[in-house]
């Protein structure tokens, strides 16, 4: 776990506030579109959709939920589940979520570990917040699908992605190597986890939102997130959080990594543009340090390439 800016233990005057927190464990945030693979896999596990399902997003990129409107940046037409993730369609994700019964959807999110301590034992760990389904209106269920209305830590998000990486098995988070067998719980069917992981590879393609998260020679599965932050008058268009959560190698997962940027400056603030390249750099070095064999010759996109399709 790495936090920047960090602190210098020899310079006490500069060691204040946020510099002293392990943000990956203590801080929580709305995860945005990084929740979409969790939504898709939950719906598949509940039998609401399957790998061949098609989702209609044809109403001019708009979905009315009561008096509220959910929007996509453009009209994507009919999408398969991989397309919902590749284009990062809010309308598609919300449409899927609204097909699930609230209690069943909540139980799936709970089983992934949202709203619960990971049990890592780090001082000050936050359990985040997952509202109980009994308080959901339809719009709350819809926005949970694309990561608004709950709060998570980076460690919780990594643990949830580790379920997809581990073919549907949830294992406890630990900072210590143990020779004892770890408790484990099956959350997703083996085939569902593999199908979703394959769908997530499309996000890192040139047609997805994160081609800059690609790593030469390795298959990568992941999801971007670009989250509007809350200001004094509600969500603002001036302050963002950029995220990328990913798994590598997607063919035989060994590592999960979550990168989070608070309020990137300038006009470049999308998760695929800001967090994606950092993921590729850190994960690429980690794969080399662990001597993990490449999948094949998968070239990295040119550095000037920007996200195509959706941008969330």
What are these regions (language model features)?
Residues 264, 269-285:
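Amphipathic oligomerization regions
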Residues 287-312:
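Gram-negative outer-membrane assembly/targeting C-terminal domains
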């Amino acid at each position: 776990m790495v936090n920047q800016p960090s602190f210098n233990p020899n310079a006490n005057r500069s060691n204040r506030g946020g510099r002293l927190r392990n943000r990956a464990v203590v801080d929580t945030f709305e995860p945005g579109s990084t929740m979409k693979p969790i939504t898709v896999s939950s719906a598949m596990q509940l039998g609401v959709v399957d790998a061949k399902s098609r989702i209609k997003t044809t109403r001019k990129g708009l979905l009315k939920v009561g008096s509220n409107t959910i929007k996509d940046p453009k009209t994507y037409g009919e999408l398969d589940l991989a397309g919902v993730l590749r284009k990062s369609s809010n309308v598609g994700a919300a449409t899927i979520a609204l097909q699930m019964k609230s209690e069943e959807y909540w139980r799936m999110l709970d089983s992934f570990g949202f709203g619960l301590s990971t049990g890592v034992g780090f001082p000050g760990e936050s359990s985040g917040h997952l509202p109980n389904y009994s308080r959901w209106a339809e719009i709350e269920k819809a926005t949970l699908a694309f990561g608004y209305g709950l709060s998570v830590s980076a460690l919780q998000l990594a643990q949830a992605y580790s379920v997809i990486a581990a073919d549907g098995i949830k294992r406890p988070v630990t900072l210590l190597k143990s020779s004892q067998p770890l408790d484990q719980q099956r959350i997703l069917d083996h085939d569902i986890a593999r199908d979703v992981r394959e769908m997530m590879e499309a996000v890192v393609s040139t047609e997805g939102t994160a081609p800059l998260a690609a790593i030469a020679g390795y298959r990568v599965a992941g999801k971007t997130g670009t989250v509007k932050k809350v200001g004094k008058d509600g969500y603002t268009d001036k302050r963002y959080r950029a995220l990328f959560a990913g798994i590598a190698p997607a063919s035989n997962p060994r590592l999960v990594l979550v990168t989070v940027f608070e309020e990137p400056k300038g006009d470049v603030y999308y998760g695929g543009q800001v967090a994606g390249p950092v993921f590729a750099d850190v994960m690429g070095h980690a794969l080399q340090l662990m001597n993990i064999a490449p999948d094949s010759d998968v070239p990295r996109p040119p550095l000037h390439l920007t996200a195509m399709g959706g941008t969330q």
